[in-house]
Curated annotation (Swiss-Prot):
One annotated GO biological process: phospholipid biosynthetic process
Organism encoding this protein: Klebsiella pneumoniae (strain 342)
Protein name: Bifunctional protein Aas
Active site: 36
SMART domains for this protein: PlsC
């Protein structure tokens, strides 16, 4: 009677909905593992689960008055993690057929993300061989009974959903010591909990996610700031988005791919979301690619119009681009203000009241944006991402990292770079954090000063950029940073050490590719290992394809919700080439993406990058990684830049060519370093060529296409 009354009360107040297959709860041995977001969680499960479970409650909490008051509707047993008998009692309850609920986090989340997972819950599951039923609680974190005060917009009676996920099992890990078995089991349960979060992520478009963020964090919450130092709130960003959405309709058609050549600025975010809302597909133009690279991109994506800014072209000295790329129409944002009419203003005002109506009909699987590969190995390819793939990557990042609305991101990587777009714009916007958009990562004195001035807590960039920021920064500039993330190129040991010595900060290295939106793996404070790029993100499947001549590891292939829709190539303009990869039997499998990177996995699942499959040389029958050659050069000459190419060799098949900005670097110095670090002599180049400056791409990575052309031209001249 009492249980029924409270069930009706909560159903009316919170519109509680239970989803998923409840049959798993009736199996003989069941362990339910929910996330923990509020003080209401236990009551909600007791009221709305179709079985009457036993809750494991910490002894300190079980003795409080409110727990005694709840005994008519909740069965619980005290849990003392320091006493093994508590764990054994839970195992016996499960073996007797009672469903047991354990909150693996052991405490209410204070970040909105998963907290630390305690090994005890995993050990109970493995020891009892129970069926694990993961459960996600969504919405309760918005109530006053959560611990997210100041991080979300609280409301008295938000809608609450309880998601039952497909059941799974956790086998007892094989390890010699009980402590090791518990630790491994805990990591396995953590993976299950992360996969559960990914499984229930909302099916939304990017524009709908922006509206959801405004609803969750509040319309008055600042979200974007740029060098004008006038932060935009979610409401102001939405207003600009609707303005752009209305104007873009006069210059483009629904479904059209439109080029955006814009700097890191608040208006750029508005243009992106405005275009998406009205069914246009923004193609982020890499203005550092030059006329040739941009021409290839324009042709591949069949772009007819590029939106840009006169001020941006002035400051970037980029007027040669519209002067030479005459095959497209150039539209300048400064000219659009004069196009606004009274009818447009009324449309914008009306849709501010009902912003969801501004979006034309779209599905999460539809094409949302086009990014372009760097062109480091040939013509740039258009990478088409759906709303689903971009938002999946954001959700993967949110699942493993504890970003909150208290964080402030410094985003200097350009938005045409997938790292800059997803990590530098979408992730902070959808986590409630504020982002400062800065137009150039090359201003090594300015960026650290802005990090200090704007109290930034998150900074990311390439190893090259981070090294230069550290060189010019005051030791106190980075006092607020919680996360320093390196990606897009290998993190150099000297950079890592410099940050540790000067600022006391650990750089977290990650790995990504544009085709994966882009983050694939990343070290985070909860799971980090030196020398690796972290573990594969939840929701993704990974496999290694054996490569002839490579003994350790293999070619990394990936499948998951963050994989692109496909390529657009200049050789076949406008035609989408869906991802597919050859398996070990030589058969093409749809949905898999071949990264072309050679990697290894250790026993804990951490990834080590060996190098690009295309960046191996076969010398005297041995496979030599060009990445390893560059590491030798960097070790012998740490303050200079180095890059390796390949040339043909009559006696050994292929030979190495080292380009360096160190005019004093000799083969003897390279040999000395190689011998000290166990690197084979075959990996030490005989052909060393000095360049005053290495050709680089906009991301800061060496331009290997140009370097290879230089080698080929020299060989032709020599012949």
């Amino acid at each position: 009677m009492l249980l029924g009354f409270f069930r009706l009360l909560f159903k009316g107040l919170y519109r509680v909905r239970l989803t998923g297959d409840t049959q798993a709860l009736y199996q003989q041995k069941v362990l339910i593992t929910p996330n923990h977001v509020s003080f209401l969680d236990g009551i909600l499960l007791a009221l709305f689960l179709p079985v009457r479970p036993v809750f494991a409650v910490y002894t300190s909490i079980s003795q409080r008055w409110f727990m005694r008051a709840l005994t008519p509707i909740i069965d619980f047993v005290p849990l003392d993690p320091t006493k093994p008998m508590s764990i054994k009692h839970l195992v016996r309850l499960i073996e007797q057929g009672r469903p047991v609920v354990i909150f693996p986090e052991g405490r209410i989340s204070v970040s909105g993300s998963l907290m630390k997972i305690y090994d005890g819950a995993a050990f109970v599951a493995a020891k009892s061989q129970a069926t694990i039923v993961p459960l996600r609680i969504d919405g309760a974190e918005l109530t006053p009974f959560s611990r997210l005060k100041g991080l979300v917009k609280r409301r008295l009676f938000p809608r609450i959903q309880l998601h039952l996920l497909p059941p799974t099992h956790l086998p007892m890990p094989e390890a010699p010591r009980a402590r090791d078995r518990r630790k491994i089991a805990g990591e396995m349960l953590h993976q299950i909990m992360m996969e559960a979060r990914m499984a229930v992520r909302p099916r939304e478009t990017l524009y709908e996610s922006l509206l959801a963020a405004q609803d969750r964090f509040g319309a008055r919450k600042p979200c974007v700031e740029d060098i004008n130092f006038q932060p935009d709130t979610y409401r102001k960003l939405l207003t600009k988005t609707l303005f752009v959405a209305r104007i873009l309709e006069k210059y483009s058609q629904r479904g059209e791919k439109i080029g955006l050549m814009l700097p890191n600025a608040g208006i750029s975010a508005a243009v992106i979301f405005g275009a998406i809302a009205r069914g246009r597909i923004p193609a982020m133009m890499n203005y550092t690619a030059g006329v040739k690279g941009l021409s290839s991109a324009i042709a591949a994506a069949e772009i007819n119009t590029i939106f840009t800014s006169r001020t941006f072209l002035d400051k970037g000295k980029l007027w040669h681009l519209p002067e030479q790329l005459t095959q497209v129409r150039w539209v300048f944002l400064e000219d659009l203000k004069g196009d606004i009419t009274l009818a447009d203003k009324l449309w914008i005002f009306g849709h501010l009241l009902a912003p969801r109506l501004a979006q034309v009909k779209q599905q999460p699987e539809d094409a949302a944006m086009i990014l372009f590969t760097s062109g480091s190995e040939g013509n740039p390819k258009g990478v088409v991402h759906s709303h689903k793939s971009l938002l999946a990557n954001v959700e993967q990042i949110k699942t493993i990292a504890d970003f909150t609305a208290n964080d402030r991101f410094m985003s200097a990587l350009p938005l045409f770079h997938s790292f800059g777009l997803t990590v530098g714009l979408l992730t902070p916007l959808f986590t409630g954090a504020e982002v400062f958009l800065y137009p150039s990562p090359l201003h090594y004195r300015v960026v650290p000063e802005l990090v200090y001035d704007r109290n930034c807590t998150v900074l990311f960039g390439t190893s090259t950029f981070l090294a230069n920021y550290a060189r010019f920064a005051n030791p106190y500039d980075f006092y607020r940073l919680r996360y320093v993330v390196a990606g897009a190129e290998k993190l150099q040991e000297s950079t890592k050490q410099l940050w540790q010595d000067k600022f006391g900060l650990r750089i977290l290295e990650g790995y990504g590719v544009t085709e994966c939106a882009p983050v694939v793996s990343i070290n985070v404070p909860m799971a980090a290992k030196v020398g690796t790029v972290g573990r594969i993100l939840p929701g993704m499947d990974a496999r290694l394809l054996a490569m002839p001549g490579i003994e350790q590891g293999g070619r990394l292939q990936l499948k998951g919700p963050n994989i692109m829709k496909g390529y657009l190539r200049v050789e076949n303009p406008g035609v989408l080439e869906a991802p597919a990869a050859e398996n070990q039997h030589g058969e093409k499998e749809a949905g898999w993406y071949d990264t072309g990177d050679i990697v290894t996995f250790d026993e804990q699942g951490y990834v080590r990058i060996q190098g690009r499959a295309k960046r191996f040389a076969k010398i005297a029958g041995e496979m030599i990684s060009l990445e390893m050659v560059e590491q030798v050069a960097l070790g012998a000459s740490p303050d200079k830049m180095h890059a390796t190419a390949i040339k043909q060799d009559a006696s050994k098949g292929e030979a190495l060519v080292l380009f360096t900005t160190d005019n004093e670097l000799t083969r003897e110095a390279l040999l000395r370093y190689a011998r000290q670090h166990g690197v084979p002599e075959l990996a030490v180049p005989r052909d060393i060529r000095w360049l005053k400056q290495l050709p680089v791409l906009g991301s800061g990575k060496p331009d290997y296409v140009t370097l290879k052309n230089m080698v080929d031209e020299a060989e032709t001249t020599h012949e």
